[in-house]
Amino acid sequence: ATTMTNTTIRNLTPHPVTLYRGAAVDTATSKRGDYRLASGATPTREFPADGVVARAAEVGGEPDGVLPLARSMAWLPPLEVPVYAPVRFAGTVDLPAPVDGVALIVSQIAGEAARAEGRDCADLFTVADIVRDAAGRIVGCLALRRVA
C-alpha cells in the first residue's frame, strides 16, 4: 500500500465526493458493487467540488453549436428514439499538471483520457465502491481508486 504524506486533495468533479467507512454500509441490503447506506450513518469525510472540473475532450459526434433538434440523426424505429453520431474522448481539459503533495479526484472518463494522452497519473484518483441510500440515489463512496 502506498501512503502519501501531507497530501492536499482537490476534487475536480462537479459535485462533492462524500467518503463513508465500511461500517456505514447496511450489510443486510448490500452486496458487492451495490452498497447501501445504513440508517443513521454519517460520512467520514467530504471533499467539496473545487470549482475547476477536469474533463475529457469529446472528438467526433455532432458539431458544436448545433441545437439537438436541428441535428441530423438516425432513428431507432419503431420507437422514434434519436441516435446521435458516436464520440470518443481524446485528451483532457482543465486537468492541472501534477504537483507534489496534491492528489486530484477526477471522473473515470477524465482519468482514462489522461492515461491515454500519456500523462503521469500517480496523482489521479476516482471514486470506488459507490454507496447509495435506500431509494437508490448515490450518496458517496467507500474509497478512492488510483488511475492506473
Set out the residue ranges of the language-model regions.
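Intrinsically disordered, low-complexity segments enriched in small/polar residues
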Residues: 5-148
